[in-house]
Design a protein with these regions (language model features):
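Residue-identity detector for glycine
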Residues: 2, 18, 34-35, 41, ...
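Aromatic (phenylalanine/tyrosine) cluster motif
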Residues: 8-11, 24, 36-39, 519
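Basic, short loop/linker segments at the boundary and entry of helix-turn-helix/winged-helix-like folds
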Residues: 65-108, 113
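Anion-binding and metal-coordination hotspots
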Residues: 39-40, 45-46, 114-127, 137-529
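Hydrophobic alpha-helical membrane-insertion signals
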Residues: 41-70
Length: 529
């Protein structure tokens, strides 16, 4: 019978005998390490203060063998950081600086364990032996001042690409370990609440930045108009760009005011993140104000990954926010199969749906539900072909009220010059292959964001300004990658359920059940490619 069980048995025996709680008694001869209490014959030990005793101990003994930081230290090489930042330090002048490897290790500790402020991080390092072990501090070493991070950020790393380079090198280490293959990528965005009061703003006119695909769209519009015998559109390069009224935060002007369905209103940033399908390693993160649409930076960031990491991308999984003509066309031009979600378009009750107007590609016209043709009229600057009905026929139509409210009785149906690419992407979504690809989104990029928000402080922007928030997102993503690399490699080293034999059994089960992972399917299996 154990000591705890004996204690509770004594309590029960005393209650059965009709006794209330019996008083504790101090033993006559306490040991040097503490006194003794007796209750119904059971001895309880009371500890004596031992804080000032000397012990022979090492940090290596105090850190558990299965601690996350031990796994990270064994799996990830941080020495590259010193070479990345060497040109930013003076070798023969000034006081000795904090080792940059140690500094970034401390920052990674903060993101790994959700420590929100650098001041609190230093308090944690002061008392946590695992943190000291990881940073190579002795028990009696003085930890750096919290201002060390802010001063390096402000004086040394401003206007540099150090954070991006460190993130990229972590990804390269994952590639070398075989944890990333770059065949199937998933991209999404999440919002971070800016460190700004949503009630303090000015309404200003901001110029609209031309989209990255503007030149390609203009060329497609001119080619389409020429094919239909129309003149090219006049474009005045000296014409000032369009502008619109926008809420500008007084506290953090770099943030953007977000107005989206089912999203909070206020000043936010967007973290556009891409993960690899194999093990959900983050391969890219890019920060914009929340007023920027998800699709705008997508193709540029995709090209950057293909160039930087030499990815041979075969397919991408995206949500409905990326289902735009420009993205669909861009993916086709790059030979990448896109699988995207579908969003029901806005529809006025009582009116015909656009899908009820059938497109006749041979005659290049639409046919209305009443069987009347809407021939091609023109192609506008936004890249949309306009198909217009005959006003005389529509004026006598019995269902005109369900078709158009036009005062001149003309129904206009639009079709983008890149609409065919959208239709192929949408058809791919409905195939069995496309459904398997899309189903993996929730296990990859959505799970990555969930972990970031729940465990790594990704709900709020810690600092103000686009550059500093980008630093936060890069370090948080790098910390998540470091953690995943370490855990995956530790799992491979460990024998048992995660060993090779069990993986083989799981693969057989997937083959039998038809639940094989999406990245196991080559592009040739895609019937729509």
């Amino acid at each position: 019978m154990g000591p705890v069980h004996r204690i509770f048995s004594s309590f029960a025996r005393a209650r059965r005998n009709g006794a209330r709680w019996a008083p504790f008694q101090i033993a006559d001869k306490p040991s040097p390490s503490g006194g003794f209490l007796f209750f119904n014959g059971v001895m309880l030990k009371t500890p004596m203060p031992t804080q000032h005793e000397l012990e022979m101990v090492t940090l290596e003994e105090l850190v558990p063998k299965d601690h996350l930081l031990r796994q990270i230290d064994a799996a990830v090489d941080f020495e590259f950081i010193r070479a990345k930042v060497a040109h930013l330090y003076c070798a023969d002048n000034g006081r000795p600086a904090l080792d940059p490897v140690v500094m970034f290790k401390l920052l990674f500790i903060g993101y790994l364990f959700g420590v929100r402020s650098e001041r609190q991080l230093m308090r944690e390092v002061q008392v946590n032996v695992a943190y000291r072990w990881f940073a190579r501090f002795r028990l009696t070493d003085k930890v750096p001042d919290a201002s060390t991070f802010s001063q390096n950020r402000r004086r040394r790393f401003t206007d540099t690409t150090v954070y991006q380079e460190i993130f990229d090198e972590i990804v390269r280490q994952a590639i070398k370990r075989g944890l990333v293959d770059g065949r199937v990528l998933y991209t999404d965005s999440t919002h971070l609440k800016a460190n700004a009061n949503k009630g303090k703003f000015d309404v200003v006119k901001l110029e609209q930045t031309p989209a990255a695909y503007t030149e390609a769209l203009n060329a497609a519009v001119d080619a389409d108009r020429a094919a239909h015998g129309r003149k090219p559109l006049d474009r005045d390069d000296d014409e000032p760009p369009s502008s619109k009224d926008t809420k500008l935060s007084r506290t953090d002007p770099d943030s953007g005011y977000m107005v989206r369905d089912d999203k909070p209103k206020g000043f936010f940033y967007l973290d556009h993140r891409t993960v690899d399908a194999k093990h959900a390693i983050i391969t890219d993160t890019h920060v914009t104000p929340a007023s920027v649409h998800d699709s705008q930076p997508y193709l540029d960031r995709l090209d950057r990954q293909r160039e930087r990491f030499e990815f041979k991308v075969e397919a991408v999984g995206l949500d409905a926010g990326y289902f735009t003509p420009a993205v669909c066309q861009g993916l086709e031009e790059r030979g990448i199969a896109g699988v995207m979600g579908y969003r029901t378009p806005n529809h006025k009750p009582g009116m015909f749906y656009k899908r009820q107007f059938k497109y006749d590609a041979y005659r290049n016209e639409y046919v209305c539900p009443q069987g009347q043709a809407l021939p091609y009229s023109t192609t506008n600057r936004l890249g949309y072909r306009e198909y217009k009905s005959n006003a005389q026929i529509c004026g006598r139509c019995p269902v005109r009220s369900q078709c158009t409210n036009s005062a001149i009785a003309v129904k206009v149906v639009t079709r983008h010059v890149w609409e065919r690419a959208k239709e192929r992407v949408d058809a791919r979504r409905l195939t069995e292959w496309g459904q398997r690809i899309y189903a993996r989104r929730k296990q990859t990029v959505e799970r990555s964001f969930a972990d970031a928000k729940q465990l790594h402080g990704h709900r709020y922007a810690r600092m103000r300004g686009l550059r500093k928030v980008a630093e936060q997102c890069l370090l948080a993503a790098a910390a998540q990658n470091i953690k995943k690399i370490a855990m995956l490699l530790a799992r491979k080293r460990k024998k048992g359920p995660a060993g090779p034999d069990w993986r083989f059994v799981r693969m057989l089960l997937r083959l039998v059940s038809g639940l094989r992972c999406s990245f196991d399917y080559p592009l040739a299996a895609n019937p729509q490619s």
